[in-house]
């Protein structure tokens, strides 16, 4: 006898946004033999760094006259050295076609500046201090005038209090909590250095984005919340943002 589903079944999944750091390998030449040798040398220096490391293969810096890339061979070499390819970044038609053929996602070229990673430095154990340093607590930053679109206000080492409206396009950042005593229509990012106990308080939730310690919700998600437009408190539990009425 088949089981009849209820008209309003419980959701079996959620789509969530998260800010993750992923290693990008930028290929300068399509010489797979040289790549194999150089990767082997890097692995010998820092084996723990190359252990199921997620990877984006960036082919967008290859010269237009550079020969075609053997993408399956490139992915295989990376896998042999502990790098797991998630997607490629490309702008040449032949590279995009090769990625589609092996069912790899294609990302657009990035205009952002990317930091060069030294695997040896990344793997080196950091010496722990004998006694944890006392946290440096800075005075709360208080803003009394309206925060307009395009403005960014950062409370380093402490809380941020805004006793005026925050317009769309404005951005509030704090290492601690954020309090907005007025309409919150911009972006609010609390605990930006990883403080999972940080909170966001606002008199009117109409934000473009709210974030605590890297976990965030955008306006499309927030508008579906029954507390949209109400006075709320936002906290983080695990990787879930909880919104409750003030």
Curated annotation (Swiss-Prot):
Question: Which GO biological-process labels does this protein carry?
Answer: cell morphogenesis; division septum assembly; regulation of cell division; regulation of cell septum assembly
Is Cell division set as a keyword in this record?
yes
What are the entry keywords?
Cell cycle, Cell division, Septation
Q: Does the keyword Cell cycle apply?
A: yes
InterPro entries in the cross-refs? CAP/MinC_C, MinC, MinC_C_sf, MinC_N, Septum_form_inhib_MinC_C
Source species, domain of life: Bacteria
A Pfam family this protein belongs to? MinC_C
Q: Which Gene3D superfamilies match?
A: 2.160.20.70, 3.30.70.260
The protein's matches in HAMAP family, at most eight in alphabetical order, are given as:
MinC (MF_00267)
Report quaternary structure and partners. Interacts with MinD and FtsZ.
Protein family (similarity comment): Belongs to the MinC family.
Q: What does this protein do?
A: Cell division inhibitor that blocks the formation of polar Z ring septums. Rapidly oscillates between the poles of the cell to destabilize FtsZ filaments that have formed before they mature into polar Z rings. Prevents FtsZ polymerization.
Q: What is this protein called?
A: Probable septum site-determining protein MinC
